[in-house]
Every structure is written in C-alpha cells, then in structure tokens.
Regions:
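Active-site capping/gating regions of soluble enzymes
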Residues: 1-38, 43-46, 50, 61-87, ...
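Conserved, mostly hydrophobic/aromatic
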Residues: 56, 185, 255
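Active-site cores of enzymes that catalyze phosphoryl transfer or operate on phosphate-rich substrates
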Residues: 80, 84-165
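Short, conserved phosphate-binding/catalytic loop or strand-edge motifs used
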Residues: 177-183
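Short loop/turn motifs enriched for small/polar and acidic residues
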Residues: 186-190
C-alpha cells in the first residue's frame, strides 16, 4: 500500500490539513514483528517476563470496511487490541425517533439483557457499603435509546471484526496463550466527558455480544502532556467510573495519559488499585528531543537544531493560518511557551513580531509548540515545514526518517534512559511497584555510561 502510493490520509485539525496515515492498520504488522525481534536480539526473552504488544486504535467501520481483512492480518501478533469505533460513528446519523429505530433494528432480547445488567450494576452501586462515594446509576430511557441508536451499527461491525481476529489467531496459533488477546474499548471519542451510565451501557453491550472488555477508556478531559489541574475533581471522576468498571471486571485505560503530575498518577493508581493502563504515545518523541538536546554529539545537535527550527516554522505558519482551528491552537502553543518563560504574550500583530518573540526563547524541548509539532518532523520530506511535505512515505520521507535511525550511541543511551526513567516514575506513582524497587532501578539506570552496557544489562 505504502510503496504503491495508496496510503489513506488522516485529518489533523490542529495543523489544518490531512497527513498520510502512519500508525493504523497494516503498519501494526511491521511494528509487532520489530518488537518480537528486538526482544530476541537483546535477550529479553531469557528473563521469562510476559509482555504485551498493543495494536492501538484499530479503526472499525467507515472507510476501513474495505481494508478489514488486511487490518486483521496486521494484528495477529498483537496481544492487546484497542477498538476505535469513531470511523463508523462519524457516518452514523441517529434517527429522530431513536426508540423506534432501536425497536426495529436491535434484538429485543439483547436490549433487555443490557438494561438488566446496567440495573444490576446500578443496584450494587446504591449499596454504598465498602464502596467509595456511592454513585448509583440513573438509566434514562430516552438517553439509552439515543446512545444505542448511535453505537449499534459500529458495535455490530466491532463484533464482526472481533470474530475475524479470533479466527485468524485460531488458524496461526496452537495454544490457548497464543490465541488469547485482550480487548480495549475506546469510548473517549464519544461526545463530552463520559458518564458512568454510558460506560455501563457500553460494557454491558459488549458483554451481551460475547466480547469481554479488559480495558475501557472513558473521556476524563485529559490533554496530552498537561497535568490535570484538580486532583480532588479527578479522584471523583475516576471513582465514579471505577465503581462501574469493577463490576464488569474491566480496568481503566487513561488515554492522553502522558505528561500528568505525580499526584495525578497517584490518584489513578489509588482509586483503581493498579488496574489501569496509561497511554503514553505522546511522550516518546518528546523524550527523543530531550535526548538529542542533551547529547554532545555534533550530528545529534545538528538534528536537534533542525527539529526545533521545524516546529518554530510550523508554529508561525499556524498562528496566521486562515483555518480558525489551526490558528487558535498554534497561538495557544506559542503563548504557553512564552508565558512559562515569563515573556509577554501579545505577540500576534504580525508574523515578524511572533518570530521575534519565539526566537527570544532559548531552544528547548519543553516548549509546548515543540511538543505538539515535533512528531511531524520524522517523515517530513527534506525536513521541510510545509504541509505538502508532511507524512511523506516516498524515499524523500524515509531519508528524513533515516536521520533519526542514525543518531549516535550517546543519543540512543539518553533516549533509552529517558524512557525507562519515565516508566519507573509511572510504576512508582501508580503503585504498580514499591518505591524501594523503583529507587534501585533509577540508580541502576543512572549508572549506565554506555549504550552497550545498558543493552547487555537487559539479558542479565
């Protein structure tokens, strides 16, 4: 698909354009193979530690119907699949009389089963003994019908996809361990903050369809790389969701979970008892930037300078875009960086004024505009800050990617230590590992002076 120039595109409203897709579908196949090979290469497999590969945001329905079989093939080594209903939801129009539509299109027995299951959960929540802040559910018939009419077409397609995943694994694996996989249901694409009632209905629907959900991802109002400002409010939101999830045996997935405060993570871990997943994909190119910024290698420094300049140019272009969303977001990114450095934020009278303000800042991977735009540099043809150059899967784009593959051992060591240190930070603050164990791990990481020593330590 890529070599034939047939990649689909993905909208990125904050940059006002579409970019050829790079992470959904068949690309999962290559990444999962790479992960398996890396474990064998480093000797990690000799430790006998179970690990999981997540096929993130696998698209259900919509324009992906025609590619479904290829998507299934791409996920056979994924032990953990996230179902993303948004492509089908985007083309679903709810009938004016949602209840009548449901009566005509949804099996009556299934609706009765779902309502009974939600009522059962609600009754258990009414009994607040042993439960933090009793949060009884209130199932409104009209709201139930509207939600069901909205999600039913996508859930039917999710069930069909799930059956195909199971069949593909049954064909290729001979053991129960190989055939098994975890399911995550992403519902943070539904409008607004997710209510406990919505979570209960979605979990009950999947349960009734024979799809055990191991993780569910509600919307908590998170923004990537930004701490949640109110820990008391966050605790309340999570407690209400956890009371429902616990009844279904599901853990909570925290999407846009990177860059939160230690206190935020402590709340997540305390409320769920460690039954959680934190999506950290927004963190990794940031940590690469920090690694190159700190490297003394001349080639690493040259890549860092080009990378930073690229984000500056996109920020300035975006700040004066005719697209309202792109302009708004670019200005938010710029003013955040300026205000955190103690600078004035009235800088949008002209592109020249904006450029002068940004260039007065010392280059840093901590600036929000760098964090938000940096991932686009990896496949920008020629490293150009132009919309036509973004997400380039031709040789020009891969020559740009090769610059990242060619970073020095010092840069690689910095990157590996940054990622590992971040994971230790998460493990400690969510309570997944004792503080003493985490402190030992941090000390060990700090002691690695060469990449070779770190890699050799993986198999020990």
């Amino acid at each position: 698909v890529m070599l034939a120039g047939k990649l689909d595109s993905v909208p990125f409203p904050f940059i006002g354009t579409n970019v050829p897709e790079g992470h959904q579908g068949q690309s999962v196949e290559g990444m999962s193979h790479g992960c398996v090979l890396s474990k064998l290469k480093t000797g990690f497999h000799t430790r006998g530690i179970a690990w999981s590969f997540n096929a993130d945001h696998q698209p259900i329905g919509g324009k992906f119907d025609s590619r479904e079989d290829a998507l299934v093939t791409g996920c056979v080594l994924a032990s953990y699949i996230t179902f993303d209903l948004s492509p089908e939801l985007a083309q679903t129009k709810v009938a004016d009389d949602a209840a009548a539509w449901c009566a005509a299109h949804v099996p009556v027995a299934l609706m009765a089963t779902v309502k009974a299951r939600v009522a059962e959960v609600g009754a258990s929540l009414d009994d607040t003994r042993g439960r933090p802040q009793g949060t009884p559910l209130h199932l409104n018939e009209a709201d139930f019908s509207k939600l069901l009419a909205y999600v039913w077409p996508s859930l039917q397609k999710m069930k069909a996809r799930d059956d195909k995943y199971a069949a593909a694994r049954a064909k290729l694996f001979t053991t129960d361990a190989g055939r098994a996989y975890l399911r995550e249901l992403s519902i943070d694409e539904l409008p607004g903050l997710t209510t406990p009632e919505t979570t209960a209905i979605m979990l009950a629907l999947c349960e009734a369809l024979g799809m055990k959900i191991h993780f569910v991802a509600p919307a908590f109002g998170f923004q990537k790389n930004m701490p949640y400002p109110d820990n008391v409010a966050l605790r309340g939101l999570i407690e209400k969701q956890w009371a429902v999830c616990k009844d279904f045996g599901a853990s909570i997935g925290f999407h846009s979970g990177s860059g939160k405060s230690a206190e935020n993570y402590q709340v997540m871990g305390e409320v769920t008892g460690g039954r959680l997943e934190i999506k950290t994909s927004g963190r990794y190119t940031y940590e690469m930037g920090r690694a190159l910024f700190a490297s003394k290698n001349p080639a690493d420094q040259a890549l860092w300078r080009d990378w930073y300049k690229f984000t500056v140019e996109l920020a300035i272009l975006g700040a004066y875009s005719a697209d309202a969303t792109e302009q708004k977001m670019a200005r938010v990114f710029v003013t955040d960086a300026l205000s955190k450095c103690g600078r004035g934020v009235d800088v949008f009278s002209s592109p020249t004024v904006t450029r002068s303000a940004i260039e007065s800042l010392a280059p840093s991977p901590e600036h929000m505009f760098w964090f938000e735009y940096n991932f686009l540099h990896v496949l920008a043809a020629g490293g150009r800050a132009e919309k036509a150059a973004l997400g380039d899967h031709t040789p020009a784009g891969y020559r740009q990617r090769a610059r990242f593959y060619a970073i020095s051992d010092e840069g690689r060591l910095n990157f590996a230590k940054n990622i590992a240190t971040y994971l230790v930070f998460l493990a400690q603050n969510t309570g997944l590992a004792p503080a003493a164990v985490c402190e030992t791990a941090r000390a060990k990481l700090a002691g690695y002076q060469t990449l070779a020593a770190l890699l050799a330590g993986i198999a020990r």
